[in-house]
Curated annotation (Swiss-Prot):
Its EC number is 2.5.1.152. InterPro entries: Nicotian_synth, SAM-dependent_MTases_sf. GO terms for biological process: nicotianamine biosynthetic process. This is D-histidine 2-aminobutanoyltransferase. Induction: Up-regulated in metal-poor media. Keywords: S-adenosyl-L-methionine, Transferase. Belongs to the methyltransferase superfamily. CntL family. The keyword S-adenosyl-L-methionine applies. Catalyzes the nucleophilic attack of one alpha-aminobutanoate moiety from SAM onto D-histidine to produce the intermediate (2S)-2-amino-4-{[(1R)-1-carboxy-2-(1H-imidazol-4-yl)ethyl]amino}butanoate. Functions in the biosynthesis of the metallophore staphylopine, which is involved in the acquisition of nickel, cobalt, zinc, copper, and iron, and thus enables bacterial growth inside the host, where metal access is limited. Therefore, this enzyme probably contributes to staphylococcal virulence. Appears to be specific for D-histidine as substrate.
């Protein structure tokens, strides 16, 4: 067992060092983006490998494990952010690129809400829309719904707006740096998606309880277990506020989805 522990620890340390090095390079020169995208794709395959998942779960050094997870969560979130920025710039310059990691995310959108599907009469809020807001664009184009994206990064907001102007100029899409408490039409929001790389997503969810209507549905992207090295994990919620009505565990996808409704709304899993 110690050999397995040492192996998984070594692999994760190597990934951490690679991500840190690639991130510094790509900040200096966009040409290194392909190497970072390749690393992200390889990392995704590693996470979805059942053998490594077993080794990760068997690793019992809690403190050492937790520290590595925290470091990997942070650096991979920064890498995703930077890749989105460069992809946005390239698209605006007339170039296009794709990676397995981003394909994985974009192909997951149809699964977000199960039977609580989005229609043209709905309004979606995406918390953490990023510089390359394909979720917003895909939802708006496929459903006709009104969509709002919020992000605390001014660069992401600027690039996101420009991407929307190019790819979906006729859709009802708003991107802003406002906080959830500052959104004037927050009561009209019917569906909410949280990006998986937001560390404070459960604090924002708690804040949303008093701001939103009684029937709002929340899709929380998360990663537990080995998936936590590329996502922030799920957390318990106050039983009298948000009720997790379904956890959609997806062995072949890089993150899973937890569906929440307000505790006052009694909904069974079969209704989701």
């Amino acid at each position: 067992m110690n050999n397995f522990n040492n192996e998984i620890k070594l692999i994760l340390q190597q990934y951490l060092e690679k991500f840190e090095a690639h991130y510094e390079r790509v900040l200096q020169d966009d040409q290194y983006i392909e190497a970072l995208e390749t690393l992200m794709d390889d990392y995704s395959e590693f996470i979805l490998n059942p053998i490594y998942e077993q080794q990760f779960n068997a690793w019992r050094d809690v403190e050492e494990k937790a520290q590595l997870i925290k470091s990997l969560q942070y650096i991979t979130a920064q890498c995703v952010k930077q890749v989105e920025v460069i992809r946005a710039r390239r698209l605006l310059d007339g170039q296009a690129s794709t990676t397995g990691y981003f394909d994985n995310i974009e192909h997951c959108i149809d699964e977000e809400f199960g039977q609580c599907s989005i229609t043209s009469n709905d309004k979606l809020l995406l918390v953490g829309s990023g510089a390359y807001p394909m979720t917003l664009i895909q939802v708006a184009k496929e459903t006709g719904a009104s969509v709002i994206g919020i992000d605390i990064d001014p660069q992401a907001v600027d690039l996101g707006r420009r991407i929307v102007n190019v790819l979906a100029p006729n859709e009802d899409i708003t991107i802003t740096d406002q906080k959830v408490s500052e959104l004037k039409d927050i009561k009209d929001v019917t569906h909410i998606i949280f990006s998986s790389t937001i560390p404070l997503k459960y604090s924002i969810l708690e804040e949303l309880y008093d701001l939103t209507n009684e029937n709002v549905v929340v899709a929380m992207r998360f990663g537990d277990g080995i998936k936590a090295i590329f996502n922030y994990p799920s957390q318990e919620t106050a039983e009298d506020k948000w009720q997790c009505v379904n956890k959609h565990m997806r062995p072949q996808q890089i993150f899973d989805i937890a569906l929440y409704k307000k505790a006052a709304i009694k909904v069974g899993i079969t209704d989701v």
